[in-house]
Amino acid sequence: MAQQRVLPQSKETLLQSYNKRLKDDVKSIMDNFTEIIKTAKIEDETQVSRATQSEQDNYEMHVRAANIVRAGESLMKLVSDLKQFLILNDFPSVNEAINQRNQQLRSLQEECDKKLIALRDEISIDLYELEEEYYSSSYSLCDSNDLPLCEAYWREDFDMPSPESLSMPLTTATAEQSIATSQSSTPSHPHVNGHGAGPTDHS
């Protein structure tokens, strides 16, 4: 069996005051209502005139009705105070509500994560198929000089000058360039009878 929680002295006193207010208000309603019923009873004639007695009874009924209304308002205020007391001091219920809400949010988070993972897998598959389609169609439908992205990337790496060529002296590079230019500009003469044509003599 769960042990009964021991309330602090202030809370215990507060609950006792709530209990006393409840009993007093209910007793006030019952007493005033009973007196109103008694006042409605027609009594025998007394020394007081009937008109005076009617005014007195009318005033008494108004007062007791006001007391009933006041007691009812006090009970409504007591209900509000009890709700506030339970909300502020019922920590086990508050913790249980918080735990339930946390579990709901965790389950919702797990569901969202599963949906996101499934969506990621579908996108990956579609992306792979699109890449396969793109690379397979680039050879047959495009120009022969067009390369896939990966081959174009590596081709750029091969076409780039090496660090050694960048560090070569300017004179050496110029000399090599001039030799290549002279070789390309010298006309080649066909061999006649197995001998190459020599340079023409000028007189």
UniProtKB/Swiss-Prot annotation:
Segments for region (Disordered): 164-203
Any GO CC annotation of this UniProt entry: mediator complex
Chief site of localization: nucleus
Biological-process GO terms, alphabetical: regulation of transcription by RNA polymerase II
Disulfide bonds: none
Pfam families (UniProt xref): Med22
Biased composition (Polar residues): 164-188
InterPro entries xrefs: Med22
Subcellular location: Nucleus
Keywords, in A-Z order: Activator, Coiled coil, Nucleus, Transcription, Transcription regulation
Keyword Transcription: yes
Coiled-coil segments on the chain, per record: 93-123
GO molecular function: transcription coregulator activity
Family: Belongs to the Mediator complex subunit 22 family.
Summary of subunit composition and partner proteins: Component of the Mediator complex.
Its biological purpose: Component of the Mediator complex, a coactivator involved in the regulated transcription of nearly all RNA polymerase II-dependent genes. Mediator functions as a bridge to convey information from gene-specific regulatory proteins to the basal RNA polymerase II transcription machinery. Mediator is recruited to promoters by direct interactions with regulatory proteins and serves as a scaffold for the assembly of a functional preinitiation complex with RNA polymerase II and the general transcription factors.
Protein name according to UniProt: Mediator of RNA polymerase II transcription subunit 22
